[in-house]
């Protein structure tokens, strides 16, 4: 059974945990505070019995962490309240509250109010209730705040912002499976953060808000994970002109996903996105220099022409027998591509594939192969498949500037000598296919 540290328990000295030769107290106070900041506040408070010097030292610790499961029933709120009132540090750098009891959650609003009055810089609130009821976040404390820089909210929290918030210094906002009261609350929160740079959103339902609008001019990093498979209801509207990093994962069966172009975009990762009625995802990524795509080919719209003029690095994780089509589309659309990575792109047995699944040789060699591609990596290369062998051969033959190619295959046991021999024969044959115009370093690996 888990041993829990309870406030008001047996003293450390009485349990023989205090050495008569107290060397740790000789450390500089700044170092002691740094050490104590990494511990749960319940443990930090327990150190007050060590000596006269330690009696008030915990009150200066800038980072406080409380977990309701380490408190006796009905004592959590009182203990947190007393700790916040007794806190003497000039600034409260961070406060972590983890609440697992419905009764303790009732006083969260009061505790948050005290913390905000202490000029808090980082606040993490995690509420997990068995009844799956939601605790309303006190919006009044967000009406005018110029010290909070990081806000992280998790699970059973209801966000209701009837008017525009004013979080002038907020730079990072993390929302994990929280609920909004309405679409207006989303806009009032995000539009009231003029310094917001990093936004992370995890959702598994569109029942609270159908149109999730993210319009933040200052936003530089955006991550959205939505594992809800919808029925063509709801979606996202994203307008972030300063965006440099975009990560979208799990947009399945949404009604729409509309993204304004981000001219400063550097890197984007798009995974498990398909069957969206109205979307422009790929068209919004044309400024990216680095792309990672994990998609079922052509389940979303692909614009035509050489549109990825800035793209230098492409990682492709397709999971359909049609993935060749996506590969050639991206190569043909990215004339300056220098790095190509293929990762486990084939997960379907040949007998399950429809007619016409075989790879067909492109009519024209993509420009990036002729003039720019320098690095080619293929992870979990299926050397026994003729189609994959044909693709690898084509790239090696036509990539005139290729400097290094790495192909990794699944391991083969030493008892399968015949299979090992066939793989060695195939790899040796492949090694002869590299374009004679380059000095490519061809590497074969086994995972």
Swiss-Prot record:
Domain FBD: 358-409
SMART domains membership: FBD
Residues annotated as domain F-box: 21-84
Annotated PANTHER family: EMB|CAB62440.1-RELATED (PTHR31900:SF34), F-BOX/RNI SUPERFAMILY PROTEIN-RELATED (PTHR31900)
Superkingdom of origin organism: Eukaryota
InterPro entries the UniProt entry points to: F-box-like_dom_sf, F-box_dom, FBD, FBL13/AtMIF1-like, LRR_dom_sf, LRR_FXL15/At3g58940/PEG3-like
Protein name, as recorded: FBD-associated F-box protein At3g49020
GO cellular component: nucleus
Organism of derivation: Arabidopsis thaliana
């Amino acid at each position: 059974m888990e041993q829990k540290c309870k406030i008001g328990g047996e003293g450390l000295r009485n349990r023989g945990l205090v050495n008569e030769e107290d060397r740790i107290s000789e450390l500089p106070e700044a170092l002691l505070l740094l050490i104590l900041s990494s511990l749960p506040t319940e443990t930090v408070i327990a150190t007050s019995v060590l000596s006269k010097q330690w009696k008030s030292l915990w009150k200066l610790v800038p980072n406080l962490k409380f977990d309701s499961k380490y408190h006796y029933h009905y004592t959590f709120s009182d203990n947190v309240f007393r700790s916040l009132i007794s806190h003497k540090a000039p600034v409260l750098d961070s406060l972590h509250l983890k609440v697992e009891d419905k009764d303790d959650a009732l006083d969260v609003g009061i505790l948050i109010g005290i913390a905000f009055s202490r000029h808090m810089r980082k606040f993490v609130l995690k509420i997990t209730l068995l009844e799956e009821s939601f605790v309303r976040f006190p919006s009044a404390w967000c009406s005018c705040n110029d010290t909070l820089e990081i806000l992280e909210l998790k699970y059973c929290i209801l966000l209701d912002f009837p008017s525009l918030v004013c979080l002038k210094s907020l730079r990072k906002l993390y929302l994990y499976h929280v609920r909004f009261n309405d679409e207006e609350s989303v806009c009032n929160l995000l539009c009231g953060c003029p310094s917001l740079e990093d936004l992370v959103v995890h959702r598994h339902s569109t029942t609270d808000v159908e149109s999730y609008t993210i319009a933040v001019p200052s936003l530089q990093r955006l991550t959205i994970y939505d594992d809800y498979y919808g029925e063509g209801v709801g979606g996202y509207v994203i307008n972030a002109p300063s965006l440099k990093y975009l990560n979208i994962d799990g947009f399945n069966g949404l009604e729409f996903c509309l993204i304004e172009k981000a001219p400063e975009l550097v890197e984007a990762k798009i995974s498990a996105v398909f069957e969206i009625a109205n979307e422009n995802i790929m068209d919004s990524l044309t400024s990216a220099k680095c792309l990672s795509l994990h998609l079922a080919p052509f389940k979303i719209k692909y614009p035509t022409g050489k549109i990825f003029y800035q793209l230098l690095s492409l990682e492709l994780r397709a999971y359909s027998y049609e993935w060749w089509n996506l590969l050639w589309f991206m190569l043909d659309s990215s004339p300056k591509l220098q790095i190509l990575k293929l990762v486990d792109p084939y997960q379907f047995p040949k007998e399950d594939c429809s007619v016409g699944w075989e790879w067909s040789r492109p009519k024209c060699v993509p420009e990036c192969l002729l003039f720019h591609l320098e690095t080619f990596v293929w992870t979990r290369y299926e050397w026994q498949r003729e189609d994959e062998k044909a693709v690898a051969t084509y790239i090696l033959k036509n990539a005139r500037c290729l400097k290094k190619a790495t192909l990794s295959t699944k391991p083969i046991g030493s008892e399968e000598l015949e299979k090992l021999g066939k793989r060695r024969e195939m790899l040796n044959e492949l090694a002869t296919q590299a374009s004679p115009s380059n000095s490519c370093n061809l590497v074969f690996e086994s995972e």
